UniProtKB/Swiss-Prot annotation:
It is a multi-pass membrane protein. Belongs to the cytochrome b family. It comes from the Eukaryota. This is Cytochrome b. Binds 2 heme b groups non-covalently. GO terms for molecular function: metal ion binding; ubiquinol-cytochrome-c reductase activity. The keyword Transport applies.
Length: 379
């Protein structure tokens, strides 16, 4: 008798994705982040669901409903902090996952890569709207500043912003719709992630060498299931350390003050995972230029496959490209730091330099480095 997992219509899908999936035998821990992102998403949906049971999406009661969750609901505090810090873990895994794709040339799987870029943008939108929901000072002013950027779009900008706000300022209508979108988007992300996986399984995984691994494949279970479980345990351990010891480490103290449209906080800044884009946005003196630069800072990922000039797929055997990659990482860390600093000398100049470097490395220096390596190898 043939095993039920290979014949049953539903079990067959699970089997082909997680059990009998032929996987390269040499993929490293950098390949763990895909499954970790899945775990993060499930965790966020579950904690978010329980938070939504007690949250009220109304300007008058939103802030106090979050306080009520933390003080009066059984284990509400841990659910709230797991959700808030879970978002940070989500983005750490996202950045690692994208970085892995850049380093090992996984972006040559075009459909999978473009689907991933869409997933990244959707997740960023979801996180932004979630940050607005507690209705603290930074929630309100963050929402005001970021939505206001759309007014830079010529001709339709002002109408577009007022349409998104549902009025002439960020108010009741804005909060209600942001809650609705924040609730629905994670389920859309889950569906998109399935499509992402579907595209990946059409080609099979890449591996650190970038060389086709058809000659040396092993079953996903038990080898990589056990490896994913180890990764998951490390993820949950680090999340719980954050939640139980320093839950407010990555948050903004201003968000413990209820939203007040009459009082602007001295430094308006988003959560840490948006700071690199925020720094790029601020580094251009022109409003529309800044908005375009910030959007392109993410959309530039779509161009990466077309800028691949190397004869090798992975950077594993390309030391010059490796240097470029790590300079890019350092540049992104610099941008993240600058995004959290006030707009004054010397931060302005550093931010502008780091922003120019970011685009220069991806658009010019990396393709040039690849061409140099090709010539050195006489390819």
């Amino acid at each position: 008798m043939i095993n039920i997992r290979k014949t049953h219509p539903l079990m067959k899908i699970v089997n082909n994705a997680f059990i009998d999936l032929p996987t390269p035998s040499n993929i490293s821990s950098w390949w763990n982040f895909g499954s970790l992102l899945g775990i993060c998403l499930i965790l966020q949906i579950l904690t978010g669901l329980f938070l939504a049971m007690h949250y009220t999406x109304d300007t008058m009661t939103a802030f106090s409903s979050v306080t009520h969750i933390c003080r009066d609901v059984n284990y509400g505090w841990i659910i709230r902090y797991m959700h808030a810090n879970g978002a940070s873990m989500f983005f750490i895994c996202l950045f690692m996952h994208v970085g892995r794709g850049l380093y090992y040339g996984s972006y040559t799987f075009l459909e999978t890569w473009n689907m991933g870029v869409i997933l990244l943008l959707t997740t960023m939108a979801t996180a932004f709207m979630g940050y607005v929901l507690p209705w603290g000072q930074m929630s309100f002013w963050g929402a005001t500043v970021i939505t206001n950027l759309l007014s830079a779009i010529p001709y339709i900008g002002t109408n577009l912003v007022e349409w998104i706000w549902g009025g002439f300022s960020v108010d009741k209508a804005t909060l209600t719709r942001f809650f609705a979108f924040h609730f629905i988007l994670p389920f859309i992300i889950a569906a998109l992630a399935m499509v992402h996986l579907l595209f990946l399984h059409e080609t099979g995984s890449n591996n650190p060498t970038g060389i086709p691994s058809d000659a040396d494949k092993i079953p996903f279970h038990p080898y990589y299931t056990i490896k994913d479980i180890l990764g998951a345990m490390m993820l949950i351990l680090s999340l719980m350390l954050l939640v139980l010891f320093t839950p407010d480490l990555l948050g903004d103290p201003d968000n413990y003050t209820p939203a007040n449209p009459l009082n602007t906080p001295p430094h308006i800044k988003p959560e840490w995972y948006f700071l690199f884009a925020y720094a790029i946005l601020r580094s251009i003196p022109n409003k529309l230029g800044g908005v375009l630069a910030x959007v392109l800072s993410i959309l530039i990922l779509v161009l990466v496959p077309f800028l691949h000039t190397s004869k090798q797929r992975s950077m594993m055997f390309r030391p010059i490209s490796q240097c470029m990659f790590w300079i890019l990482v350092a540049d992104l860390l610099t941008l993240t730091w600058i995004g959290g600093q006030p707009v004054e000398h010397p931060y302005i100049x550093i931010g502008q330099l780091a922003s120019i470097m970011y685009f220069l490395i991806i658009l010019v220096m990396m393709p040039v480095a690849s061409t140099i390596e090709n010539n050195l190898l006489k390819w």
